[in-house]
Amino acid sequence: MQTIIRVEKLAKTFNQHQALHAVDLNIHHGEMVALLGPSGSGKSTLLRHLSGLIVGDKKPECRVELLGCTVQQNGRLARDIRKSRANTGYIFQQFNLVNRLSVLENVLIGALGSTPFWRTCFSWFTREQKQRALQALTRVGMVHFAHQRVSTLSGGQQQRVAIARALMQQAKVILADEPIASLDPESARIVMDTLRDINQNDGITVVVTLHQVDYALRYCERIVALRQGHVFYDGSSQLFDNDRFDHLYRSINRVEENAKAA
């Protein structure tokens, strides 16, 4: 099975606090993987390293690869990082859309990496690009809102526009950082259904950070759980039982309660 993401001995320190401890991780083509863990466990930090949004500690053994290309090593981004980012769709918790633009214009932003610079200056997109953008919106059930300003949409609708933008980008990997954290249950279900549909029918590898364990169990075949910057569990979601859940979350809560009491 083809390895899409490879992480070797990744460590990250923020202000003398070790956020990640020598993390090793391999993610294969077509997987949908949930990154779980309490707040501060390092799951979002790990996800940001995968696309090179942040770099790890300056250690020769620290390395991140995506689609066979180096993203970062020894605390430095690869010179051809733009190539890796072009293949990676990143979905943020707060959508990261341009409110003053229409839904269609926001989706077309996904084509900037493959559009000549002079065209981007004037927002001159080809008919074929506009057609692909409409197809992406159809895929996520948002084509009827194509010419509506994105600021008028609900949170769940905006997140689906962000997914359409990743499709427009023709990303081979989608990294989603807490994509349903601020959504109501029905909107969260629709967003997760959309990600699973893209994963299963397009073969796009999806890595998603979640706080909601029930969604991870329902939508992802594999769970990678982090605890205080260490990989605590990496395996089938079917084997992530109550004992593991208790050790991952409740022991952390007890430590926090004891600290407050002290």
Curated annotation (Swiss-Prot):
Residues 5-253 form the ABC transporter domain. One of its GO terms (cellular component) is plasma membrane. It comes from the Bacteria. It is found in: Cell inner membrane. It catalyses: phosphonate(out) + ATP + H2O = phosphonate(in) + ADP + phosphate + H(+). Its main location: membrane. Its EC number is 7.3.2.2. CDD domains: ABC_PhnC_transporter. Gene3D superfamilies: P-loop containing nucleotide triphosphate hydrolases (3.40.50.300). GO terms for molecular function: ABC-type phosphonate transporter activity; ATP binding; ATP hydrolysis activity. It holds the Pfam family ABC_tran. It is a peripheral membrane protein. ATP binds at residues 37-44. Keywords: ATP-binding, Cell inner membrane, Cell membrane, Membrane, Nucleotide-binding, Phosphonate transport, Translocase, Transport. Belongs to the ABC transporter superfamily. Phosphonates importer (TC 3.A.1.9.1) family. Part of the ABC transporter complex PhnCDE involved in phosphonates import. Responsible for energy coupling to the transport system. The complex is composed of two ATP-binding proteins (PhnC), two transmembrane proteins (PhnE) and a solute-binding protein (PhnD). PANTHER family: AMINO ACID IMPORT ATP-BINDING PROTEIN (PTHR43166), PHOSPHONATES IMPORT ATP-BINDING PROTEIN PHNC (PTHR43166:SF6). This is Phosphonates import ATP-binding protein PhnC. It comes from Shigella dysenteriae serotype 1 (strain Sd197).
